[in-house]
Amino acid sequence: MANIVVKKLNSTPIEELPVEIVERKGIGHPDSICDGIAEAVSVALCKMYKEKMGAVLHHNTDQVELVGGYAYPSLGGGDIVNPIYVLLSGRATTEVFDKEKCETIRLPVGTVAVNAAREYIKNTIINLDVEKDIVVDCRIGQGSVDLVGVFDRENSIPLANDTSFGVGHAPFSTTENLVLKTEQLLNSKEIKKEIPAIGEDIKVMGLREGKKITLTIAMATVDKYVNSVEEYEEIKAKAKAKVEELAKEYADGYEIEVFVNTADSDNCIFLTVSGTSAEMGDDGSVGRGNRANGLITPFRPMSMEATSGKNPINHIGKLYNILANIIANDVAKIEGVNECHVRILSQIGKPVNEPKILDIELITDEGYDVADIEPKANEIAEYWLNNIEEVREKLMTGEIKTF
């Protein structure tokens, strides 16, 4: 039986704190681009391994670096003169040795990785020409395994690759939810169709002071859709109005203040050719941005571990961060739970469904006791440990988002 501990959290609920800060780096931010590429490569490798070998082989593609290019954005349309450089590194199984046939099966890791990276960028930064404005360099380290070991591994519970931990919390606060929904709105297909000048490089910083939430939004614009400074200001105003309307739905009862591109000056505005600052010297790296729940939350417990690109089979930095958030969300739905924090610790070499400890901390509503909630919380935690394969499968197919 798993070592599950459910206890009272002696802390002020997040909504009652006088101050709260929440951040989200949008899908076009250089750090998020790296997260997205790393995860897309992992998902693509999982698919290739399953098709060719019947099992997902060892890989970690969480080492993606982006070096910013050089561009000359201009009202009405400019040019990228030096391409963005993306380095894919990490480790992956490129060879499988079949002892019975005395032959080595070679797997197209590099081709799959580069194609996955390019396809992700093409679908994410829609105004970037992936044929000429970006260079993808694959330097993923090679590894090999024995064919017999592949099938032995597929039929057993994976062992933890490290002694590490994952962290999750639920439910999202009003500020957390609003920050996440704001970026998702501005990067939605509907908004891109309505206001094509809005780029994908969007960062949302939320500050709550009592019942007032201030959103500061850095939003790239695409120069070919902006013909004058007046048009640029109109685009900002439209984006601001959209966010203010959104806030009525997700932050009813709060005073909302929205700022867009506060660094603008008379001779400097957030204008890009492609919709991302990566075109103009802004670098990126995996794990420097959003946590596994899609947010950066300094007022909550967080893991510093990068989730994207790690293998979904036994890498604790991925599995347990995702699992902790899933368990926290389910426990938070129990009647009487105000807030839930989950921490899961592994022990290297032990089965991933047998953590050293799974710690659940609860803030309860008035009139409820932790002892009343503990059985249901235990049941939820045990269910997900027993069904960890479901989480792994959803990670393999990209169904679960990691940033």
Curated annotation (Swiss-Prot):
Record field: catalytic activity: L-methionine + ATP + H2O = S-adenosyl-L-methionine + phosphate + diphosphate
EC number: 2.5.1.6
Residues where ATP binds: G141, Q142, G143, S144, V145, D146
Domain of life: Archaea
A Pfam family it matches: AdoMet_Synthase
GO terms of molecular function: ATP binding; magnesium ion binding; methionine adenosyltransferase activity
Keyword Nucleotide-binding: yes
Record carries keyword Magnesium: yes
Name of the top EC class for this enzyme: transferase
Pathway, per record: Amino-acid biosynthesis; S-adenosyl-L-methionine biosynthesis; S-adenosyl-L-methionine from L-methionine: step 1/1
Keywords: ATP-binding, Magnesium, Nucleotide-binding, One-carbon metabolism, Transferase
Protein's GO biological process: one-carbon metabolic process; S-adenosylmethionine biosynthetic process
HAMAP family (alphabetical): S_AdoMet_synth2
Protein name (database record): S-adenosylmethionine synthase
Species this chain originates from: Methanococcus aeolicus (strain ATCC BAA-1280 / DSM 17508 / OCM 812 / Nankai-3)
